[in-house]
């Protein structure tokens, strides 16, 4: 996660370099940031961006955060479009509902940086995030090794419509499906929330009695 922050700070430093000749307090470069959630690492990202912006006269950063609400995030992005921001940074909640408004910003000539989660088109300027398909494959290999290629598993995934959850599941299944003696019993949506993941797991443990335990060394 810190890699995302460092890359975004680099973007801010470049933007700040474009306006260093501005007089103090004159806003010349506006950055709009649309966050999909307000968990701890996103708070850190927001604080680092705001702190970096303080080093440059004329740079203003406005951050709007929603709690996993697609409609509200679309409204926030449209607010930034109408405000005429010079740069838009978006961490999409779910890809499909947020794609149209991000495309609208891009079509209006606003540079768009998509962070952590992708959208369903190529209408953005840059993407800062992990290779979630490879992460899913790594998890699949780990599970296969722990079970010695034989057993039953359940998957508690992230928010169903978010691209990291989609990509990680596909990467995971690309490995597991090649193991004929490993069977996926169920897949549940944990929505990136620990409490919800625990709740889903408790329900599965009550309803499923054949979840394999890894072999201990």
Show where each model-derived region lies.
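Bacterial N-terminal signal peptides that target proteins for export
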Residues: 1-8
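Bacterial N-terminal signal peptides
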Residues: 8-17
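Hinge/beta->alpha junction and helix N-cap segments in small-molecule ligand-binding domains
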Residues: 34-46, 62-72, 94, 117, ...
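Signal peptide-proximal N-terminal region
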Residues: 47-63, 177-182
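Flexible loop/hinge segments that line or gate small-molecule binding clefts
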Residues: 95-134, 145, 152, 158
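Residue-level detector of conserved catalytic or cofactor/ligand-binding positions
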Residues: 209-217
